[in-house]
């Protein structure tokens, strides 16, 4: 459990700033920063299109929440914080500009929170949320009481953000809009680098890599980079990094290394090897090869901070997971047999493939049924062939329409096209779900006894999973349709 220090670490207040307004406050990243600022004593308001768990939580903590975007929402603000999803023509942004109220991106506010703290920033295409959560859990186990801002719900804390009493701030660094270059942490972690959010980088993967170098060079000369040497792109970039770094991975040349890895049901166990340390056995209460790498990153950071091995191993063994990261929502008697419902946020082919691998390892003899919702037309276009290959690995695929996240439709980068390409590949016959309201009936027609139903994606598929959980996957209820 998190135990506060006797003396709270004092962070200077932002001069002239009392009222902070967030446009798009319902997102995990935005809402997390808003929660920390509320707990620091600032007046916080925010707007979003509709209520969700985040807006409900912030409202309960004292934030003023508006639904819908209008100019009057920012009248009392001293600064307006916007997410990357907010259109520059948003009426609240326009009003703030007219009133000469500073409009800043989320990462700029996070950078301000980090400026007077010992910042630990976690970047990478995959694994940011889990790695950030593991680091926060280890620091809490060591009674260092960190502040953290995470892109998912940390189950042990019941929140994705918390104001701690120590100097430590542990946060995800968002590469999706390149805003992570605003951060100036003491420790930077990079888990991997793959093409994603390529519209931010004008479709130039080299430009993305250069931006990661800029992010790492924001470290002070006495800072530390923690890098996954198993990632081929990171390995190629090592000669360009002009800061001290530690490497981690399965590779024999890694500074922090896992050997003798065993994967059991929902856990991983390995021998930890570090230079100038005795080998120890580690159990991570999270499944899959990818989570061993995430744990190694967390161990590297903790070791650099001189956290004792006992705290590290206890935290990893008792890690209670994150919302929507291979989250088991229950096994239900559907009327014709038992079906296990698992929900996962992964929306990049590498992430989806890792999720499938964990499901196959956990339940090798059970059929895998996936309801997948692609996220963004641009990602579907850029990674099209990888999606076709990976999604063909399940036994039954129900493919929902692309969750646009505000993007215009791109010809040939939609779910119908994916279905056509998978049929041509010949491994399975995907089921196209033209209307999400048809999903329950299609599930009722296709689920069998002992199936694993995996709801996958970063759009509103998570809410769909919760509704399926409420229906307990009962075939009669599924045929009736959504309860709301």
Curated annotation (Swiss-Prot):
Binding site for ATP: 124-130
Primary localization: cytoplasm
Parts forming coiled coils: none
Any GO CC annotation of this UniProt entry: cytoplasm
Keywords, comma-separated and alphabetical: ATP-binding, Cell cycle, Cell division, Cell shape, Cell wall biogenesis/degradation, Cytoplasm, Ligase, Nucleotide-binding, Peptidoglycan synthesis
Function: Cell wall formation.
NCBIfam families assigned: murC
Protein name, as recorded: UDP-N-acetylmuramate--L-alanine ligase
């Amino acid at each position: 459990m998190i135990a506060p220090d006797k003396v709270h670490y004092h962070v200077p207040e932002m001069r002239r700033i009392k009222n902070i307004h967030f446009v798009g406050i319902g997102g995990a990243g935005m809402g997390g920063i808003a929660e920390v600022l509320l707990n620091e004593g600032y007046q916080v308001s925010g707007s979003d299109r509709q209520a969700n768990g985040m807006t409900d939580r912030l409202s309960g903590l004292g934030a003023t929440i508006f639904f819908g975007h209008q100019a009057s929402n920012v009248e009392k603000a001293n600064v307006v914080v916007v997410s990357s999803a907010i259109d520059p023509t948003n009426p609240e942004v326009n009003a703030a500009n007219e009133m000469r109220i500073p409009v800043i991106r989320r990462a700029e506010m996070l950078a301000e929170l980090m400026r007077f703290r010992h910042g630990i920033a976690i970047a990478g295409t995959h694994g940011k949320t889990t790695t950030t959560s593991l680091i926060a859990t280890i620091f809490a186990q060591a009674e260092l009481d960190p502040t953290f801002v995470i892109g998912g719900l940390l189950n042990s804390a019941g929140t994705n953000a918390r104001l701690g009493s120590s100097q430590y701030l542990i946060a995800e660094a968002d590469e999706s809009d390149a805003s992570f270059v605003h951060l100036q942490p003491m420790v930077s972690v990079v888990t991997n680098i793959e093409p994603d959010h390529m519209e931010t980088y004008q479709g130039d993967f080299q430009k993305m890599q250069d931006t990661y170098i800029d992010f790492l060079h924001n470290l002070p000369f006495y800072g530390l980079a923690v890098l996954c040497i198993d990632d081929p792109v990171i390995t190629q970039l090592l000669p360009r990094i002009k800061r001290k770094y530690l490497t981690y991975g399965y590779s024999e040349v890694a500074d922090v290394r896992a050997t003798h890895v065993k994967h059991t049901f929902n856990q991983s166990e390995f021998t930890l090897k570090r230079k100038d340390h005795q080998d120890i056995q580690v159990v991570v209460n999270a499944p899959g090869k990818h989570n061993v790498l995430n744990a190694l990153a967390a161990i590297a950071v903790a070791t650099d901070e001189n956290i004792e091995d006992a705290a590290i191993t206890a935290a990893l063994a008792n890690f209670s997971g994150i919302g929507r990261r291979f989250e088991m929502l229950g096994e239900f008697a559907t009327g014709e047999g038992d079906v296990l419902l698992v929900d996962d946020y992964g929306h990049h082919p590498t992430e989806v493939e890792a999720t499938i691998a964990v499901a196959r390892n956990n339940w090798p003899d059970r059929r895998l049924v996936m309801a997948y919702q692609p996220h963004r037309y641009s990602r579907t276009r850029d990674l099209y062939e990888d999606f076709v290959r990976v999604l063909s690995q399940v036994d039954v695929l129900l493919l929902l329409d692309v969750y646009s996240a505000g993007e215009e439709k791109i010809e040939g980068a939609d779910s119908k096209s994916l279905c056509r390409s998978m049929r041509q590949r010949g491994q399975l016959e995907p089921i196209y779900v033209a209307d999400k309201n048809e999903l329950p009936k299609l599930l009722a027609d296709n689920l069998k006894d002992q199936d694993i139903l995996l709801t996958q994606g970063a759009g509103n598929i998570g809410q769909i999973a919760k509704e399926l959980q409420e229906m307990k996957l009962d075939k009669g209820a599924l045929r009736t349709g959504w309860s709301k």
